[in-house]
Amino acid sequence: MSGVWGAGGPRCQAALAVLASLCRARPPPLGLDVETCQSFELQPPEQSPSAADSGTSVSLLAVVVIVCGVALVAVFFFLFWKLCWMPWRNKEASSPSSANPASEILQSPSSRGNMADKLKDPSALGFLEAAVKISHTSPDIPAEVQMSVKEHIMRHTKLQRQTTEPASSTRHTSFKRHLPRQMHVSSVDYGNELPPAAAEQPTSIGRIKPELYKQKSVDGDEAKSEAAKSCGKINFSLRYDYESETLIVRILKAFDLPAKDFCGSSDPYVKIYLLPDRKCKLQTRVHRKTLNPTFDENFHFPVPYEELADRKLHLSVFDFDRFSRHDMIGEVILDNLFEASDLSRETSIWKDIQYATSESVDLGEIMFSLCYLPTAGRLTLTVIKCRNLKAMDITGYSDPYVKVSLLCDGRRLKKKKTTIKKNTLNPVYNEAIIFDIPPENMDQVSLLISVMDYDRVGHNEIIGVCRVGISAEGLGRDHWNEMLAYPRKPIAHWHCLAEVKKSFKEGTPRL
């Protein structure tokens, strides 16, 4: 019966009430045990053992859960209070501060208000240095105190640098401008505590002095370039014999030649040309195992006096090698034979031997004029003439013509050419080539002038090239800038022809 207490609806309740009334009757009806009726009367539904036990278990479980939750919340708040609450941390940090004078200065409210006065005292700067070191690792120091200390140290650093650093030359100011400013605690001015020797020297340890490194690197680069270009000197003399119409070249001696052999010496000799004629090649004797040879040899070049102004003297110094190709030491090119005198008497000349790996070939020169009309956007190149061109045919002549290419960003936009002049090394053209170029595009274009040799059977060969434009070098850039500076006026110049090292690279020949 106890298992069904509280179950069912009104009928069950009515049945239970009837059973309870029967049990209370005296004597009980037949079929009912007296002990059963007593237990039924003494244990009402709300006091049954099973119901009491289940209620007690649920209550105990709820109490345990509540207690555990309260404990976890208490632990969480305790940890938060210990770790994150700033007033407690300031209180804990202030307890050992009495042992540290720097901390007392930085933590006391009065010191914060009078920090500017205390910074002026030299005796407090020792504590400031410790405070700066602490501020890099501990967040206990307030931000405004740290900022004031840093500003004071930076101000003293600048004053100390201005008074103790030597003035550097203007040669290195551009390099120093790119170096970052660094603050060092050791560079603080300590007043009269430092000895005079220490006050005279910069106290910022670890600072880079760019003038030392740059001076060394500049000197090293200059020495390296001089060593690369210096190949000794050569002494020769020139004299013209008017009776025989002969130019007499006397090779006297060479001095301080570079060593080409493993034993530290060379076997030098000299080749002599009177350009543009390369067929007449003269050569000195070979001098063995010496870097300062004495030649003292005369060489005769038959040439009319009127042609001397168009001739160049080319001296090539070689090292003789019996078993392999002769090594070139360097060369000397004398463009003006009348540089030293009028050649009526013998004149001694000293020249530096220029470094060269192979004999430079005189390809000739071309003369042309440039004229630009900004309003019409028209560029006119007039090919006037060429002289002393290189002979490309077996007959000793060439069939030259000039090809002009308009280049923009490495691409060839247009090309035009002159007529062909047969069997000549000094052609005269006087032909105009016109290109339409807007003024806003003049900084993006250049002209490539190629002197070609016409061949009826095979491919036409390039004798030499030159280039004018903003991206050109030397005379090519100067000629272009002069044309832009004087519009509507033809500007004419002679240009030397150069070899093409590589035919085409991205549409542009390399000179």
From Swiss-Prot:
Presence of the UniProt keyword Transmembrane helix in the record: yes
Binding site for Ca(2+) 3: D321, S324, D327
Cofactor: Ca(2+)
Binding-site list for Ca(2+) 2: D261, D319, D321, D327
Organism ancestry: Eukaryota, Metazoa, Chordata, Craniata, Vertebrata
Cysteine motif as annotated region, ranges: 12-38
GO CC annotation: cytoplasmic side of plasma membrane; cytosol; exocytic vesicle; glutamatergic synapse; membrane; perinuclear endoplasmic reticulum; plasma membrane; postsynapse
Similarity remark: Belongs to the synaptotagmin family.
Assembly: Isoform 1: Homodimer; disulfide-linked via the cysteine motif. Isoform 1: Can also form heterodimers with SYT3, SYT7, SYT9 and SYT10. Isoform 1: Interacts with STX1A, STX1B and STX2; the interaction is Ca(2+)-dependent. Isoform 2: Is not able to form homodimer and heterodimers.
Top-level taxonomic group: Eukaryota
Organism: Rattus norvegicus
Described purpose of this protein according to its UniProt entry: May be involved in Ca(2+)-dependent exocytosis of secretory vesicles through Ca(2+) and phospholipid binding to the C2 domain or may serve as Ca(2+) sensors in the process of vesicular trafficking and exocytosis. May mediate Ca(2+)-regulation of exocytosis in acrosomal reaction in sperm.
Polar residues: bias regions: 160-172
Keyword Lipoprotein part of the UniProt annotation: no
Modified residue annotations for Phosphoserine: S217
Binding site for Ca(2+) 4: D393, D399, D453, D455
Residues exposed to the Cytoplasmic side: 81-511
Domain remarks in the Swiss-Prot or TrEMBL record: The cysteine motif mediates homo- or heterodimer formation via formation of disulfide bonds.
Protein's membrane topology: Single-pass membrane protein
GO molecular function (one): calcium-dependent protein binding
Binding residue positions for Ca(2+) 1: D261, D267, D319, F320, D321
Gene responsible for this protein: Syt6
Annotated protein name in UniProt: Synaptotagmin-6
A Pfam entry, by short name: C2
